Amino acid sequence: MEIRAEEISQIIREQIKDYEKQVELSETGRVLSVGDGIARVYGVEKCMSMELLEFPTEHGVVYGLALNLEEDNVGVAIMGEDIHIKEGSEVKRTGRIASVPVGDAVLGRIIDSVGNPVDGKGPIEAKEFSRVEVIAPGVIARQSVNEPMYTGLKAIDAMTPVGRGQRELIIGDRQIGKTAIAVDTIINQKDSGIICIYVAVGQKKSTVAQVVETLRKHGAMDYTIVVAANASDPAALQYIAPYAGCAMGEYYRDKGRHALIIYDDLSKQAAAYRQVSLLLRRPPAREAYPGDIFYNHSRLLERAAKLNAELGGGSLTALPIIETQAGDVSAYIPTNVISITDGQIYLEPNLFFAGVRPAINVGLSVSRVGGAAQTKAMKQVAGRLRLDLAQYRELEAFAKFGSDLDKATQAQLNRGMRMTELLKQPQYQPMPAEREVMSLYAGTRGHLDNIPVEKVLEFEKEMLSFVDRKYPEILSEIKEKKIISEELDGKMKKALEEFAGVFQA
């Protein structure tokens, strides 16, 4: 057998010619230590802040978020189970900053903080992704809030109105209806074209399921995205959930559309951030929160804005929720968020247990946007309401002493009692703006003064259905023209007088 060298070299040349090797370069490191959802990683020198790192384990890939970039190691918050990550395990850089899917593909879905679906409806076919952390629009990019965003709750729309692009805080103790206000507001956006994002942070899965079921029952899931970071999820996921939800809302804001985001609640997000920060050995400040906790909330809430006309005039409205302990509004996190937002709706346990629901304390609740977020019609009926109720609260305290009251004081007390009753509203029954105007008109113009207090809500319900039947043009004119002209005022007065005769008969 003869071996031909040139034949062999020819075969080798042909083999080499067809060989294509793809070189894949990835910067890797090693885990120095791991525990409590935090890993210290060595070797990923070009790692960026907020970059996703991959931890390959025998049970699949776990992702982590690079938070501390130190001289000799990187502090990583692990966004999943850390029990399979061992000391000395390999870590890979992804080169990607944390981002989430955005757009209409996410509507009606329940997702976690990193954009994975958790509703069992299959993968999300998103065409666009957006970074979780982006810089808020600058001063020139914005315009002042000038358009109402109705909550459907008479007490809020009349006295602490919310405008598109505003940040209005909902604050109060546990279990007094903070989430109920947020859910009612979402339900009320049904025909407004506003996309809603509900961010649940640190809540029980059963609570989130209940909210989702309520939204589904009222047909609100068609225009709502739910971002859930439950109580059992790692602190890192709870910390970035509001930013993830905000990125989804910004997509609509930047497209010239309108979005509403609810953070339920930022107290739990602050606690999660405190946990992560302390485990990363960042120095603690007041109440053991890290020094940048104010910045953490301000950079999130500043992303809610009303953009100017050149940028499409879109808006993102934020309703952050803060839970207080025994009504202490002067604690660290509540004071921080109050100073960042454009007003607050303060809910009070005493009112809640007295049956005033929504339990809004009129004196402590404000909207720093105010009349700019109201239509002319709403301003006309609600102008005196806040003052009347504040005076009623003062007089009520005096009336308890049982001293003889003059007629004017007695009349004011009677009006206040009826207005307080009129502002009560059952849960999941938001009211269109034109019906709110009609209802408040009846109260502020004295048409309820002779009605017994316990019959006020019955009067309101029957009066609105009477107007629907006999005078539908009143409601349609309020809706279209957004102002109560002298002619319309006369019609409204006539309708109410006619109904009062029927109601008492």
Curated annotation (Swiss-Prot):
It is a peripheral membrane protein. This is ATP synthase subunit alpha. Its EC number is 7.1.2.2. The keyword Transmembrane helix does not apply. HAMAP family: ATP_synth_alpha_bact (MF_01346). ATP binds at G172, D173, R174, Q175, I176, G177, K178, T179. Belongs to the ATPase alpha/beta chains family. InterPro entries: ATP_synth_asu-like_sf, ATP_synth_asu_C, ATP_synth_asu_C_sf, ATP_synth_F1_a_nt-bd_dom, ATP_synth_F1_asu, ATPase_a/bsu_AS, ATPase_F1/V1/A1_a/bsu_N, ATPase_F1/V1/A1_a/bsu_N_sf. It is found in: Cell inner membrane. Coiled coil: none annotated. GO terms for cellular component: plasma membrane; proton-transporting ATP synthase complex. CDD domains: ATP-synt_F1_alpha_C, ATP-synt_F1_alpha_N, F1-ATPase_alpha_CD. It comes from the Bacteria. The record marks S365 as: Required for activity. F-type ATPases have 2 components, CF(1) - the catalytic core - and CF(0) - the membrane proton channel. CF(1) has five subunits: alpha(3), beta(3), gamma(1), delta(1), epsilon(1). CF(0) has three main subunits: a(1), b(2) and c(9-12). The alpha and beta chains form an alternating ring which encloses part of the gamma chain. CF(1) is attached to CF(0) by a central stalk formed by the gamma and epsilon chains, while a peripheral stalk is formed by the delta and b chains. It catalyses: ATP + H2O + 4 H(+)(in) = ADP + phosphate + 5 H(+)(out). Produces ATP from ADP in the presence of a proton gradient across the membrane. The alpha chain is a regulatory subunit. GO terms for molecular function: ADP binding; ATP binding; proton-transporting ATP synthase activity, rotational mechanism. The keyword tRNA-binding does not apply.
